[in-house]
C-alpha cells in the first residue's frame, strides 16, 4: 500500500509538535552516582523497570579511601586508577587499629542508617557475563587427529561394536584405493599374514 504524503506534515508547527511528543517518551535512563541509589527506568519490561537499585553501605576502607583516592589522584595525575587502588590498599594495611577505628565507627553508623532506611534490603550481586569457551589449542587438535588416525589403522583394540564398523569401513576403503603392499604394511602384525595370503589367492 502507498501512503499519500501531505505537505502540511513538514510544516514548522507539525515538526515542533512531533519533537515535543518525542520528548515525552516513557523511556528514561538515569544514574545518580552521588546518592545512595542507582535508578534505571525503562519503558519496557526490564528487570530494573520502575525499581531502585540500592547500593550497599560503605565499609571502613571505602569511607577512608574516598578522600585519600582524590588526594593521591591530584598528587599523581599520571597514575592509573588500578595503581591508585593498589597504593590505597597498601596504605590501609599500614594504618594502626587506633587510626582505623574512626572509620569503622563511621561505617557502623552508615550501616545503621541504611538498615533503617531500607529494612527489607537484600544484597543481590550482579551476574557476570559468561565468557565464551576458549578454542582448543594446537596441541590438543593434533592429539585428537592422531587418535583418530590410530583408531582407523588399529580398530581391533577398541570395543567390538566400534571395531566391526571401523574394520569394515577400512577394508572397503583400502580395497578400492590402496595397493596390496601398502595395505599390508598398514595392518597390525597379527593380521598381516592372513591379509597377504588372501591377496595371493586373488592373484593366482
From Swiss-Prot:
Residues 30-52, 169-204 are annotated as: Disordered. It is found in: Nucleus speckle; Cytoplasm; Nucleus. It comes from the Eukaryota. Pfam families: HMG_box. Keywords: Activator, Calmodulin-binding, Cytoplasm, Differentiation, DNA-binding, Nucleus, Sexual differentiation, Transcription, Transcription regulation. InterPro entries: HMG_box_dom, HMG_box_dom_sf, SRY, SRY-related_HMG-box_TF-like. Transcriptional regulator that controls a genetic switch in male development. It is necessary and sufficient for initiating male sex determination by directing the development of supporting cell precursors (pre-Sertoli cells) as Sertoli rather than granulosa cells. Involved in different aspects of gene regulation including promoter activation or repression. Binds to the DNA consensus sequence 5'-[AT]AACAA[AT]-3'. SRY HMG box recognizes DNA by partial intercalation in the minor groove and promotes DNA bending. Also involved in pre-mRNA splicing. Interacts with CALM, EP300, HDAC3, KPNB1, ZNF208 isoform KRAB-O, PARP1, SLC9A3R2 and WT1. The interaction with EP300 modulates its DNA-binding activity. The interaction with KPNB1 is sensitive to dissociation by Ran in the GTP-bound form. Interaction with PARP1 impaired its DNA-binding activity. This is Sex-determining region Y protein.
Amino acid at each position: 500500500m502507498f501512503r499519500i504524503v501531505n505537505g502540511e506534515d513538514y510544516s514548522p508547527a507539525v515538526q515542533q509538535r512531533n519533537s515535543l511528543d518525542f520528548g515525552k517518551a516513557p523511556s528514561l535512563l538515569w544514574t545518580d552516582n552521588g546518592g545512595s541509589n542507582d535508578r534505571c527506568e525503562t519503558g519496557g519490561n526490564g528487570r530494573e523497570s520502575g525499581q531502585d537499585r540500592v547500593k550497599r553501605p560503605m565499609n571502613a576502607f571505602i569511607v577512608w579511601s574516598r578522600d585519600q583516592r582524590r588526594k593521591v589522584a591530584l598528587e599523581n595525575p599520571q597514575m592509573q586508577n588500578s595503581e591508585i587502588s593498589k597504593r590505597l590498599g597498601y596504605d590501609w594495611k599500614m594504618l594502626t587499629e587506633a587510626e582505623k577505628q574512626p572509620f569503622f565507627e563511621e561505617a557502623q553508623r552508615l550501616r545503621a542508617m541504611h538498615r533503617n532506611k531500607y529494612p527489607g534490603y537484600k544484597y543481590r550481586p550482579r551476574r557476570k557475563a559468561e565468557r565464551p569457551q576458549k578454542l582448543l589449542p594446537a596441541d590438543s587438535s593434533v592429539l585428537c587427529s592422531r587418535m583418530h588416525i590410530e583408531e582407523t589403522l588399529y580398530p581391533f583394540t577398541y570395543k567390538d561394536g566400534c571395531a566391526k564398523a571401523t574394520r569394515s569401513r577400512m577394508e572397503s576403503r583400502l580395497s578400492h584405493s590402496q595397493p596390496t603392499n601398502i595395505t599390508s604394511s598398514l595392518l597390525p602384525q597379527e593380521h598381516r599374514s592372513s591379509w597377504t595370503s588372501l591377496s595371493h589367492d586373488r592373484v593366482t
